């Protein structure tokens, strides 16, 4: 089961995911929130995900493209050494959510 915690702070939407991603419907909910509130910057914290499959990775990369089209920016927050390089070329990875404020 996927649990989502969302916090908006200083112009940045922090989305914290915990558990397992079973589909990409959570991205639709977040996208609606972004559109409704005009949010441009999103930090997707996947540090507490138990499992990230290839399909989920592709959905997140596609989601990044959508945010870029809206002149925004997506950052991945993850300290898991095994996953650090998954998004390296497509989406910047930060170790701590606070680092987002210096990159945005």
Where on the chain are the PLM-derived regions?
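STAS-like cytosolic regulatory interaction modules
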Residues: 1-50, 65-104
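ABC-family nucleotide-binding domains
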Residues: 53
């Amino acid at each position: 089961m996927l649990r989502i915690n969302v916090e908006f702070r200083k112009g940045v939407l922090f989305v914290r995911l915990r558990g397992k991603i079973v589909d990409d419907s959570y991205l639709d909910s977040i996208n609606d929130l972004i559109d409704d509130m005009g949010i441009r910057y999103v930090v997707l914290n996947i540090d507490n995900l138990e499992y990230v499959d290839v399909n989920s990775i592709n959905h997140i990369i596609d989601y990044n493209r959508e945010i870029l089209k809206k002149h925004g920016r997506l950052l991945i927050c993850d300290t898991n050494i095994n996953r650090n390089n998954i998004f390296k070329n497509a989406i910047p990875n930060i170790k701590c959510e606070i680092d987002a404020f210096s990159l945005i």
